[in-house]
Amino acid sequence: MKITGIQNIPIEVPYYERLGPHMQRVRQTPKYPMIRTHIYIVETDVGLTGYGEGPNLGDGVEAYIGHHPVEYLMDDRAGGVQIACYDLVGKFLGQPAHRLYGPQVRSEVLMCYWTHCFVPEMMAAEARLAYENGFRVHKLKARPWESTVEQVAAMTEGMPADYRIVVDPNGSYGRPTEALRTIRELEAFPHVWALEEPISWDQVDGYKFLKSHIDFPIALHADIPSVLTAVREGLCDYFVSEFHYSAKLVQDCAIARAGENREFWVENGLWTGISHAFQLHQAAAIANIYLLITLSVLAEDDMIIEPMIVKDGYMAVPEGSGLGVTLDVDALENRRIG
């Protein structure tokens, strides 16, 4: 099997209308922000077609033509083409893509809803919508222009006990002692489950301080500091992997398993159902992936035909060969730009 052609198609997909003005405010853009990404359609000499999604590779896609898709399963530089190669090799073997990572360890994966830093009333509405749509974990982007405590109070009022919140300030809580004051207020809310990067990643001693003073689990991005450093220094309980398509994720998860078996939150399939299906397959085979995050559930179209359903917090891993999902060609024509 050889790659004979690659289509690199840029698309724009609006967020749902209810989110538009709020996303515009937090992103400070002149018009409503959109999901902007690229769909890759990879054709082969055996009649199989693979689908991927990711950043623009430009003319670089020409380098993959004439090669076997298996060459790029662990080449993260291939981005969306790499995802398409998993789809192709799985289809060629008649196996789901997760079999290319190893034995299946789970058939469904815990999902996390995502909301930016909106006013408390909007946060409350999103919390209820998330729960009604099957989510049980909800990630909140905390920022200085809104009170995290007021947001959490609005989000949790009347919510069932199995609803959990991850607070993600992206390092904006300042110094460790400043962060601790806010965290102490959050301790009053049983629904708050974990913190992601409460202070800037370079404050190694600061994370040690927080770990010794709070009970909330802490998550850090897997590349800042390195997984090895974070494990050695005992800085966190979870790692977040973002935009590390395959090789880097496998490597980081292996290091984390060796160091007290820390688990991962993966968000490398943010924008469409294609990349989200890919991360579902990764989670099906990599034992210490704990939950997945995707923004495709916030968009008017996830670009695939099959429904992606969350039930009681979990989403099933696609069962078909390859990625197990089908590109919606009508949606592609409607969303393509340029």
Give names to the regions the model predicted.
Residues 118-120, 143-148, 169-178, 194-204, ...:
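Short, small-residue-enriched loops and turns at beta-alpha junctions
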Residues 7, 51, 199-200, 283:
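Generic short alpha-helical hydrophobic face used as a protein-protein interaction/packing hotspot
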Residues 21-23, 67, 73, 184, ...:
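Shared catalytic-loop signature of beta/alpha-barrel
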Residues 1-166, 170-184, 188, 213, ...:
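N-terminal capping/lid subdomain adjacent to the active-site entrance of alpha/beta enzymes
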Residues 109-115, 138-140, 165-169, 195-196, ...:
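Hydrophobic faces of well-ordered beta-strands that scaffold small-molecule active sites
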